[in-house]
């Protein structure tokens, strides 16, 4: 996963994460619910990164942590997302699309191997040209 429950709390505050995850009304963060949202966010991110990077990314950049937190928060709001959460989600997806298309690069050590140069075949020239085949 690109982000942890602690990252969610750091970014959005414990009160909000309790409100978003506490489905049993226990008054505390439901870690399983939060981790599931973070796993889903990481899977969504991987969908964009797979075209340009070898997965899994073992040492993700802070950027991926922030994007994963925004995506997970949006998912946790289950259809009643605030305008701010929706905008942050849309911004995260737009950034992932830029990364996917190559408009934005991430300096990762896990890039896929470079494609080999295309094969080139050379010959010694034509044995039979138009002049040699005249009259046949």
Q: What residues fall within each predicted segment?
A:
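Short loop/turn elements at secondary-structure junctions
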Residues: 71-136
């Amino acid at each position: 996963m690109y982000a942890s429950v602690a990252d969610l709390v750091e970014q959005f505050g414990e009160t909000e994460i309790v409100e978003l995850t506490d489905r049993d009304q226990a008054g505390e963060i439901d870690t399983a619910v939060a981790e599931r949202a973070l796993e889903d966010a990481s899977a969504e991110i991987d969908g964009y990164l797979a075209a340009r990077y070898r997965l899994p990314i073992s040492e993700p950049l802070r950027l991926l942590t922030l994007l994963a937190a925004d995506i997970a928060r949006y998912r946790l709001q289950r259809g009643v997302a605030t305008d701010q959460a929706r905008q942050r989600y849309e911004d995260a997806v737009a950034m992932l699309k830029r990364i996917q298309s190559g408009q934005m690069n991430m300096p990762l050590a896990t890039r896929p191997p470079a494609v080999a140069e295309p094969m080139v075949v050379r010959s010694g020239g034509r044995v039979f040209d138009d002049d040699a085949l005249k009259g046949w």
